[in-house]
Curated annotation (Swiss-Prot):
Residues 406-424 have a biased composition (Polar residues). Its main location: cytoplasm. It holds the Pfam family Ank_2. PANTHER family: ANKYRIN REPEAT CONTAINING, PHOTORECEPTOR ANKYRIN REPEAT PROTEIN. This is Photoreceptor ankyrin repeat protein. Acts as a transcriptional repressor for CRX-activated photoreceptor gene regulation. The keyword Transcription regulation does not apply. Residues 335-369, 405-427 are annotated as: Disordered.
Length: 452
């Protein structure tokens, strides 16, 4: 029997709101409050222990009883003998472990039982024929509960790449799974945002090409384009607008304790309104105000609606009652800075996975070699010097002169073969114009020989 967990919202307008979980152990908060990246942490989202997992008090895990744990452990022992299903069996013989199949089948209860029993380094890093781990498959399909539980899995390398060079973050960003991207950024230690695939593309570039929404100035070594240029090239106008908004506002000021919920343009607008009230409007202004149709203006950047959203989502907002606290109030999220994950801020980060070191003296080779893209203009550099465009001030080299001379006729001339006599083979007829052409050629050759 699958347990329906009950989750309490951590923030609301003046009170506590209960949200329905829909059978999913991971709850995405929607509405006026959105938990900011890394900086706000729910008190209950700490490293869970075995007791809270069994009692169902943790937000990311379902309620498990002792009988259910024993039942799932028996299912895990039997899973090794199950036949491999169709497309989910990349390797012959089906030697993939139970951890991989729990991720593929989107079974968080079975995955939690596996994590409680302990995971070996071989099981955590096991891949299929495409080079993908269970975390990559879950990120590709959008299994949010599985990705949340795998954040507590030891020996798991979040930056592991498949045969195409894609990481778990690339697969989630390219597929447009925003909650999974947020989980990877906030709860996975050592996540490399600038890891590149075989084509030299980062996760941000792949998300921009897919119109989804790092370093915005990073370019791929093949085409030399940034994420904004890739978004423009692939007609991802929504992503272009988001990137430009992020460049205009590189820092989230309202998530700092030093933010004051005051509108800077308020004093200037009040003074302007008072000055206009003292001056009587002219006849033209009255006529224009009478004849003009009242259209609702769209929200402007830095206007009153923009300030309202910023003030209500700040940490010192008097309108929203929050039950969470920020871990780094002096360092709000900003563009160009790598924020720490929640386990790093809490000091509960697991040790990094062991990387096999090459023996000393052996050269370190990169797994992929990127070939730079050569524009059509670069072909001119390989041409001759006189073919390249030059300005009027530089000396222009002389164009070489090419003289063509016809080879003299050799003394040995091919004699026509005599036609065989008989009625079996007939000679081609020789017309009058052909005879005149032959005579003219003979005369020209005789005149040329006489001149020599």
């Amino acid at each position: 029997m699958k347990v329906q967990p009950s989750v309490t919202c951590v923030a609301s307008w003046g009170g506590i709101v209960h949200l329905e979980a829909f059978g999913d152990p991971v709850i995405v908060l929607r509405g006026a409050w959105a938990v900011p990246r890394v900086d706000c942490l729910i008190d209950t989202l700490r490293t869970p222990n075995a007791s809270c997992m069994r009692k169902g008090t943790h937000l990311l895990v379902p309620c498990l009883e002792e009988e259910e744990l024993a039942l799932h452990r028996r299912r895990l022992d039997m899973s090794e003998a199950l036949p491999c299903p169709g497309k989910e069996t990349p390797t012959p013989g089906c030697r993939l472990g139970a951890l991989y199949w729990a991720c593929v089948h989107n079974d968080p209860t079975q995955l939690q039982a596996i994590l409680d029993g302990g995971v070996s380094p071989e099981e955590a890093t096991q891949v299929d024929s495409n080079g993908r781990t269970g975390l990559m498959v879950a990120c590709y399909h959008g299994f949010q509960s599985v990705v949340a539980l795998l954040s507590h899995c030891p020996f798991l390398d979040v930056n592991q790449q498949d045969k195409g060079g894609d990481t778990a973050l690339m697969l989630a960003a390219q597929a447009g799974h925003v909650p999974l991207v947020s989980l990877l950024l906030n709860y996975y230690v050592g996540l490399d945002l600038e890891r590149r695939d075989q084509r030299g593309l980062t996760a941000l570039m792949k998300a921009a090409m897919r119109n989804r929404c790092a370093d915005l100035t990073a370019v791929d070594p093949v085409r030399g384009k940034t994420a904004l240029e890739w978004a423009v090239l692939t007609d991802s106008f929504d992503t272009v607008w988001r990137i430009r908004q992020l460049l205009r506002r590189p820092q989230v000021e309202q998530l700092s304790q030093h933010y004051k919920p005051e509108w800077p343009a308020l004093s200037g607008l009040v003074a302007q309104a008072q000055a206009q009230a003292q001056v009587a409007p002219s006849l033209l202004e009255r006529l224009q105000a009478t004849l003009s149709l009242p259209f609702a203006p769209s929200p402007q950047e830095g206007g009153v609606l923009d300030h309202l959203v910023t003030a209500t989502t700040s940490l010192a907002s008097p309108f929203v009652t929050t039950a969470c606290h920020t871990l780094c109030p002096d360092h709000p999220p900003s563009l160009g800075t790598r924020s720490k994950s929640v386990p790093e801020l809490l000091g509960t980060a697991p040790p990094p996975p062991l990387v096999p070191q090459s023996p000393p003296g052996s050269p370190q080779r990169s797994p992929w070699v990127f070939v730079p893209y050569q524009s059509p203009q670069g072909i001119l550099s390989k041409c001759l010097q006189w073919l390249q465009p030059r300005d009027s001030t530089s000396p222009r080299p002389q164009v070489p002169k090419i003289l063509l001379s016809k080879a003299s006729s050799s003394s040995h001339q091919c004699q026509p073969k005599p036609s065989p006599s008989g009625h079996q083979s007939l000679a081609l007829p020789l017309w009058r114009y052909q005879e005149l052409r032959i005579e003219k050629r003979k005369q020209e050759e005789e005149a040329r020989m006489a001149q020599k």
